[in-house]
Regions:
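Flexible, glycine/proline-enriched loop segments at strand-loop-helix junctions
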Residues: 17-26, 51-53, 89-90
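Conserved acidic, metal-coordinating active-site core of Asp-based
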Residues: 53-118
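Alpha-helix initiation and N-capping motif
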Residues: 13, 31, 47, 60-61, ...
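Conserved phosphoryl-transfer catalytic core
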Residues: 25-50
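Short, amphipathic alpha-helical segments
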Residues: 10, 21-32, 57
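Charged catalytic cores and adjacent phosphate/nucleic-acid-binding surfaces used
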Residues: 1-11, 20, 74, 97, ...
């Protein structure tokens, strides 16, 4: 599950900083282990070189690009489906954190918490169960408009948001060359998120939990 944080209003970000520092440390450890596993499996990669080319934190895409450069695969998708597949035993998945803990941390800094593209991660029958648990922690909104949603997905998300008294959000999930089929803002061509969504999110009152 992906939780988006927007519109932080407090000046004390200590809990956010502490959480992110811990996550960065865990990610660095898993990245080093992945590089070690790749090299032991015969896929020559240089982790220092991967880090130098990455803007920000290193993720699976950066490893895929290194494998492309070294001639093992031709595309990032091929890497995800083969060498870097979670089923092959080489890839080291990130250590998951509780969505509820993330929501609490966002609220500690006066932020607005949004469940991103829920129908990508959850089945329709699972979403109400999650929202029932997440709402008391301070979840503010869900993404009802998303690049890969069809009309039925959007209508279902709208009805769920209204049922649980949540604000609505939307996003293209643009990731540059990593998702070439998605354009910034317009998604796959038919996405038009109302500006009113952003205004309501920014104006929302943050409740302490």
């Amino acid at each position: 599950l992906h939780i988006v944080a927007l519109f932080f209003k407090n000046t004390d970000y200590s809990q956010v900083d502490e959480f992110l520092a811990g996550q960065r440390k865990k990610k660095e450890e898993s990245n080093k282990l992945l590089a070690e596993r790749l090299n032991k499996s015969g896929y020559n990669v240089n982790y220092d070189e991967i880090k130098s080319k990455a803007r920000g934190s290193v993720n699976r895409v950066h490893f895929a690009k290194e494998l492309i450069k070294n001639g093992y695969i031709k595309t990032v998708k091929e890497g995800f489906d083969t060498i870097l597949s979670e089923n092959l035993g080489i890839y080291v998945p990130s250590q998951k954190v509780s969505s509820f803990d993330v929501i609490k941390i966002i609220k500690s800094a006066g932020g607005v918490s949004i469940l991103a593209h829920p129908l990508i991660s959850l089945e329709k029958e699972e979403l109400p169960v999650f929202l029932t648990e997440a709402k008391p922690y301070g979840l503010d909104a869900i993404e009802t408009m998303y690049s890969k949603y069809n009309e039925g997905d959007r209508e279902f998300s709208d009805s769920i948001a209204e049922e649980f008294g949540l604000l609505k959000s939307g996003g293209s999930d643009f990731h540059g060359e990593n998702k070439p089929e998605i354009s910034l803002g317009s998604g796959c061509g038919d996405l038009a998120v109302p500006y009113d969504f952003a205004k309501k999110l920014e104006a929302s009152k943050n409740i302490e939990y």
